[in-house]
Amino acid sequence: MSSKYPRSVRRCLPLCALTLEAALILLFYFFTQYDASLEDQKGLVASYQVGQDLTVMAAIGFGFLTSSFRRHSWSSVAFSLFMLALGVQWAILLDGFLSQFPPGKVVITLFSIRLATTSALSVLISVDAVLGKVNLVQLVVMVLVEVTALGTVRMVISNIFNTDYHMNLMHIYVFAAYFGLSVAWCLPKPLPKGTEDKDQIATIPSLSAMLGALFLWMFWPSFNSALLRSPIERKNAVFNTYYAVAVSVVTAISGSSLAHPQGKISMSYMHNAVLAGGVAVGTSCHLITSPWLAMVLGLVAGLISIGGAKYLPGCCNRVLGIYHSSVMHYNFSLLGLLGEIIYIVLLVHHTVWNGNGMIGFQVLLRIGEFSLATTIALTSGLLTGLLLNLKIWKAPHAAKYFDDQVFWKFPHLAVEF
């Protein structure tokens, strides 16, 4: 029988992280430079504000959204910040290298930083399926692989299907969800007897998670409009996302009460259902020209989110063996799929309205993009999961899953692990 004491990462974590950071510094020294163009000052400030909104979403929003576990809230917040910082650095280099042929100096602009931040957001979505079961060394590996896979997907889809930045960004929902679920499927599945309570949501951490959801709710319009170039499309994206998430809040509270036998509201449902409209409307937010359609999408997305949170976790536990109380992945995968379908419907309507006869071709292109992104997400996720199972990473023992004491010093404890 193996020991239940956690495996120390004192040697491998500093060595791995600092060596990687030194390598990134060298790459930035030799292969990057700042944008020397004289950009309009007003446009510069506006561009920075969008990037600032994305950073707040990533660091505070997603960081606290995953902090609802009873004994794993410290690690959830701090590890998310660690992955964000590492992911942005690698994404800037990767996007620059993949977008240039022949290779040259990577020019760093505010737009490239926004693009890199969205790549790191993918990791923060997918890692929710494995937080509590892996250590920081394994998360470093996961960040590098997922950011690389997502960057490859963007490059391939952009070159083959001639897709713009916004449409590439909107594949992030489904890509991140299926990548994370694939990784989780490869990890040890059932929790050991006597440790199930660690996977439960506590009152105070759940309130912190709701704080993260509020930050995401406020800044989701900035996320959906971050990579759009046209001012009219950006305006439509902001308006439609705002109305969609507003309706999602009303639907989340009402639907949560309806789903409970005594009519009580579940905070765990609220964490994700309030964001449902923003996910569902994201792909087509720039095409919708009337608020009522965005509001309908917010209503439908909120109901799907509540239904998925109530019924899908048990189904996935039995069929896939993925034991996790969080419902974020079911929301992002289902609502990302809904958003893709709505986009295709609106695209067909727009094509018919303008008298263009290439309807079937346009639909096939969109289905091809979605299928390619999903396939690469599943494949790279499975490979990452198998890689994380290697013993060299010193993964925590299953008895120490969802336990902050494995990674953090608690001053009030007389004996540390």
UniProtKB/Swiss-Prot annotation:
Origin superkingdom: Eukaryota
Transmembrane segments: 12-32, 44-64, 77-97, 125-145, 172-192, 203-223, 238-258, 265-285, 287-307, 331-351, 358-378
InterPro entries: Ammonium/urea_transptr, NH4_transpt_AmtB-like_dom, RhesusRHD
Any single Pfam family the record assigns to this protein: Ammonium_transp
Alphabetical list of SUPFAM superfamilies matching this protein: Ammonium transporter
Subcellular location: Membrane
Record keywords, A-Z: Membrane, Transmembrane, Transmembrane helix
Topological type in the membrane: Multi-pass membrane protein
Coiled coil: none
One Gene Ontology molecular-function label: ammonium channel activity
Single Gene Ontology BP annotation: ammonium transmembrane transport
Gene3D superfamilies per the UniProt record, alphabetical: Ammonium transporter AmtB like domains (1.10.3430.10)
Gene Ontology CC: one annotated term: plasma membrane
Family indicated by similarity: Belongs to the ammonium transporter (TC 2.A.49) family. Rh subfamily.
Role of this protein: May be part of an oligomeric complex which is likely to have a transport or channel function in the erythrocyte membrane.
Protein name per Swiss-Prot or TrEMBL: RH-like protein IA
